[in-house]
Structures are given as C-alpha cells and as structure tokens.
Design a protein with these regions (language model features):
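Short, charged/polar, Gly/Pro-enriched secondary-structure boundary elements
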Residues: 80-85
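Amphipathic alpha-helical dimerization/coiled-coil segments
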Residues: 87-109
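N-terminal helix-turn-helix
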Residues: 2, 9-77
Length: 109
C-alpha cells in the first residue's frame, strides 16, 4: 500500500465511512432487520444519510429490504458470499503453505 494513502487523510471519504458504519450496525440483524430510523440512531447520522447509504448498498446488492416487512432492512447474501470467498482463498493458501512446508522438510532429511 502506498505511503501516501497510509499517512494522508485526504483520501478518506465521510460518505464511505458512514456507509461502512451502516454495514457494521446492520450486521447481526439479518433475521429481524432494522428500520432506517433505528439505523440512523445507532449509526449516529441523519435519516437522509441513511437513505443515501441504503440506496447505495441496495444498488451494490449489499443490502435488501426484509421480505416480511419492507420497512426494515438487512444485509444481503452478497456480503456473506464475499466473506466465504475470502475464507476459501485463505484456507487454500494455508493448505498450500502446509504442503510447501512438508515438501521442504522432506528435502532436509
């Protein structure tokens, strides 16, 4: 990562940071969902910011309305799919490292 990005706050977007906070607040509420007003209170931001964040998350397939109550929102399966992909890739990398370690250990004998 670039040193400039590590040290320069000019690259930090308040809107992106708010949206990431919204994702964090929504996590764990997939069954019952959360209303925009609850979300605004917990994320400590305005209802307008929540409306904007939810619209962007929905557009990216990261959030969806609760099927049983369309006034409530939840995180969409796409985020779980991304997390599963990361987990799978890390597991594959770990297996490859274990295989490499075993192969190099055999060479030392």
């Amino acid at each position: 990562m670039s040193t400039a990005i590590n040290n320069d706050s000019q690259y930090i977007s308040e809107q992106v940071q708010r949206t990431l906070k919204v994702i964090s607040v929504m996590a764990g509420r997939e069954a019952q969902g959360i209303s925009p007003s609850e979300l605004a209170k917990l994320a400590q931001t305005s209802p307008a910011n929540i409306t904007r964040a939810l619209a962007n998350l929905k557009q990216a397939s990261f959030a969806e309305r609760l099927p049983s109550d369309t006034s409530r929102w939840r995180l969409a399966p796409k985020l779980v799919q991304i997390a599963n992909s990361v987990s799978l890739n890390l597991n594959q990398a770990q297996l490859q490292l274990q295989q490499d370690q075993q192969n190099y250990s055999l060479l030392a004998i």
